Amino acid sequence: MRLVFLGPPGAGKGTQSTRLQQKFNIPQLSTGDMLRAAVKAGTPVGLKAKAIMDAGGLVPDEVVVGIIADRIDEPDAKEGFILDGFPRTVKQAEALADILIKKNMKLDAVIELKVDDKALLARIENRAQESLAKGETIRADDNPEAFKKRLESYHAQTAPVSAFYAGKGALKAVDGMAPIDDVSAAIEKALAF
């Protein structure tokens, strides 16, 4: 099973991908984790990413796409994978489609978690309060202003990816406003398990 999770920050993509990862024993692939692993392993793409990151730059699409192309060839991804946090743009979605064609693979589905912006802000504020109550450090991007910027960026850059996948008949929209277990059940129903 090869899946992509889409949705705004705070929608529950990480929570739901982790549940599917555990249920189906397939890796959840995070672009940030993959970049760090490629740098640590000293792969050619990792070395290129390291040079860019060390200079304070943003890693360009072709480097991120190269890391994903390498990662999905690893043995643990043979039976499938869940991409969380990628693709973020239509250009990246097109590049992913090209990679999969070259590898004779296809996505089984693209799950989009739909959550109202006001509910997202409330979730982030709640997460920050829970972290404080536990004595944990609040994530830098969990303050309301930073979150609003992330949400604006999502609507401008990542939301069009939904239309891209809808046009290919791969998009499965799921109401992410429900309780976690209900969202999980809706995802499984959308995937027809």
Curated annotation (Swiss-Prot):
It is an enzyme of class 2 (transferase). GO terms for cellular component: cytoplasm. CDD domains: ADK. Pathway: Purine metabolism; AMP biosynthesis via salvage pathway; AMP from ADP: step 1/1. One of its GO terms (molecular function) is ATP binding. Pfam families: ADK. It catalyses: AMP + ATP = 2 ADP. It comes from the Bacteria. The keyword NADP does not apply. ATP binds at residues 10-15, 127, 178. Residues 30-59 are annotated as: NMP. Its EC number is 2.7.4.3. Residues 126-142 are annotated as: LID. It is found in: Cytoplasm. Keywords: ATP-binding, Cytoplasm, Kinase, Nucleotide biosynthesis, Nucleotide-binding, Transferase. GO terms for biological process: AMP salvage. AMP binds at residues 31, 36, 57-59, 85-88, 92, 139, 150. Consists of three domains, a large central CORE domain and two small peripheral domains, NMPbind and LID, which undergo movements during catalysis. The LID domain closes over the site of phosphoryl transfer upon ATP binding. Assembling and dissambling the active center during each catalytic cycle provides an effective means to prevent ATP hydrolysis. Catalyzes the reversible transfer of the terminal phosphate group between ATP and AMP. Plays an important role in cellular energy homeostasis and in adenine nucleotide metabolism. Belongs to the adenylate kinase family. Monomer. PANTHER family: NUCLEOTIDE KINASE. This is Adenylate kinase. It comes from Methylocella silvestris (strain DSM 15510 / CIP 108128 / LMG 27833 / NCIMB 13906 / BL2).
